Regions:
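Short SAM/SAH-binding signature in class I
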Residues: 134-136, 150-158
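Core SAM-dependent methyltransferase catalytic element
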Residues: 202-226
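Glycine-rich SAM-binding Motif I of class I
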Residues: 64-68
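Conserved beta-strand/loop positions that form the S-adenosyl-L-methionine
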Residues: 57-59
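A short glycine-rich, Lys/Arg-flanked "PGG" loop and its adjoining helix->strand segment in the class I
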Residues: 167-183
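Conserved beta-strand signature within the Rossmann-like core of class I S-adenosyl-L-methionine
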Residues: 153-155, 182-190
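Rossmann-like AdoMet
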Residues: 1-54, 72-105
Length: 226
């Protein structure tokens, strides 16, 4: 599937990709960087830093922003993170250059790691740093069947249910629930009522928390021991 994509600037100065056909962005127009940090680091990774070794699945690698921010945190907090990222329609080198996320990264190591994440081979785990490895999975979520009890955290960063409703189905959430370890967490920017109801039906304990700039709420869904 060929999707038209264009680069736009968000409110915090960082850029994102806009899909005119769907009127959908890869990140919030209120701030790509702010959204990624708030949703996936503050309300996702931070819940697990006590573990020191963490397994993460990202649904929607996209620009790689969540991956590189997580890689940076792994170094800062001396964590070992095994990261898996699913992507069906990879971003091109030209688009990555136009996004210029390297300008927001803190040091040369982070900029180098960001380039390594995008140059890594698909469908095989590669070490990016002593603290971070990644397996980029080139496939559609509907085709996946992950092992049970595999992940501590799922970054659910797919396009919204308005444009990709098939990715937000009860069947998908049931499959992801099984893939999480006990007390694992699925975190997403989306707070729509139907999504939360389906997450609960799939077995999750759902919690609404304040969202990033421009969003009142976001969702955390836990796999709790009964």
């Amino acid at each position: 599937m060929k999707i038209q994509r264009e680069i736009i600037e968000t409110s915090d100065g960082s850029k994102t990709i806009h899909l005119p056909e769907w009127n959908e962005n890869y990140h919030s127009h209120h701030g790509a960087l702010q959204e990624a940090k708030h949703v996936f680091l503050k309300n996702g990774l931070d819940d697990f830093v006590h573990q020191k070794e963490i397994s993460i699945l990202e649904i929607g690698l996209g620009t790689g922003l969540n991956a590189i921010l997580t890689c940076q945190e792994a170094t800062k907090q001396d964590l070992k993170i095994n990261y898996s990222a699913l992507e069906a329609y990879p971003v091109s080198e030209e688009e990555l250059e136009a996004l210029n996320y390297q300008s927001f990264l803190e040091d040369e190591f982070a900029r180098s790691h960001y380039a390594q994440i995008h140059s890594a081979e698909w469908n095989q785990r590669q070490t990016i740093s002593p603290n971070f490895s990644i397996n980029k999975i080139l496939d559609q979520l509907e085709n996946c069947n992950f092992e049970k009890n595999q992940f501590d955290i799922i970054y659910f960063d797919a396009f919204g249910p308005r444009v990709q409703g098939e990715l937000w189905s009860l069947e998908i959430f049931q499959m992801l629930f099984k893939s999480l370890k006990s007390n694992g967490l699925l975190v997403t920017y989306c707070a729509k009522g139907q999504v939360k109801r389906d997450l609960k039906t799939a077995g999750f304990v759902v919690e609404c928390v304040p969202g990033p700039p421009g969003k009142r709420e976001m969702t955390k869904a836990f796999k709790r021991d009964l």
